[in-house]
Amino acid sequence: MSLSIEQIMEIIPHRYPMLLVDRVEEIEPGKRAVGYKNVTFNEQIFQGHYPGKPIMPGVLMIEALAQLGGVAILSLDKYKGKKPILGAVKNAKFRRMVVPGDVLKLEIEIVKVKGPAGIGKGIATVNGEKAVEAEITFMIV
């Protein structure tokens, strides 16, 4: 099952300029998802990070993974209409710079859910090369 940007916006509340998932290619509701972020020079953040050498901030790569996790968990009927809140980030490792023109492939696996809280393990790659990996704790409110 794949999701368009319009379908993604029906599931998570994020909007421009903070909507960081452009397409979902695979989804198993409540379990895992694979999606993409197309990194473009026109994004506001690149005006200041950094002039003359634009680099996607690591925290935005983490946020993109968290949003994909939100799509995965909020696709379950019992969480429809709720909001995902980032609770913690553990073991984040940044392996590669991400620049305009890159396509960031996002993969998240929901490894634990207990009540309104859960943990996802995410990896983002560019052309098969790992850019970031992290364990993300979330709350559903």
Curated annotation (Swiss-Prot):
HAMAP family: FabZ (MF_00406). Belongs to the thioester dehydratase family. FabZ subfamily. Pfam families: FabA. This is 3-hydroxyacyl-[acyl-carrier-protein] dehydratase FabZ. It comes from the Bacteria. Involved in unsaturated fatty acids biosynthesis. Catalyzes the dehydration of short chain beta-hydroxyacyl-ACPs and long chain saturated and unsaturated beta-hydroxyacyl-ACPs. CDD domains: FabZ (cd01288). The keyword NAD does not apply. NCBIfam families: fabZ, PRK00006.1.
